[in-house]
Amino acid sequence: MTSITRLFLILSGLLLSTFQVNALTMTAEETVRESTQEVLDRLHTDQDKLESNPKYIQVIVEELIVPHFDFATMSHLVLGKYWHEINESRQICFIHGFKNLLVRRYADIFLGYDDKIIAYQPTEPAEDEGVVIVKQTVTRPGEEPFFIEYPVRPDDNGWKVIDLVVEGISLLKSYHGTFQSEINEQGLQAFIQSIKECNAQEIKYDSQSMVIDTVLDFL
């Protein structure tokens, strides 16, 4: 894992939290504010469970993070031009693999990430149509603040995260560079085949709702 990637994961483990959206009756900023507090409350409420069973953090991650990220779009963006060079089944397994990569990393760092002071700046539209940038300043006592941006866009279920930008550096661009190097070294098909999730025996795909399922337990 690159140092840039590690920085993103440490800074954003909690902040890439759930976006409990009531359709689009809430603004993007209101959604981030409410859901961030919900995660803080959940970690406090479940402190005993987390201390006795650290793996319980994966339950929280699955419940509060996964449903509110557009992993299909993120996977497409992070692979870039290679996305259209792999077939649909490979696209599906890559989505699972990329999602699970993030889930595992979040679970690793969640337990020790607390005592944050979170402030918000005015939300701005992004260059891409329909995308809104939610801005946070995150400070821990005695440390310099970090500036974090959440590019989010609406779908039928509310606002969905499509990237994370910390101090001006995009998470997707960081992973894109890492994956590009691996593809250059071993080739696209070998890179895809190296992903555990791409060894599934059966993959089912509902293109209408982006419901992705396999016979394997990926977590």
Residue ranges of model-derived segments:
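Bacterial N-terminal signal peptides
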Residues: F8-T18
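Bacterial N-terminal signal peptides that target proteins for export
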Residues: M1-F8
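Sec/Tat signal peptide C-region and signal peptidase I cleavage site
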Residues: F19-L24
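Surface-exposed, charged secondary-structure patches
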Residues: R104-F146, C198-L219
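Surface-exposed, polar/charged faces of alpha-helical domains
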Residues: T45-D48, S52, E88-S89, D115, ...
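Early exported N-terminus immediately downstream of N-terminal targeting peptides
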Residues: T25-Y106
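Short beta-strand edge/turn micro-motifs at domain boundaries
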Residues: F147-K173
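Low-complexity, intrinsically disordered terminal/linker segments enriched in charged
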Residues: D163-L219
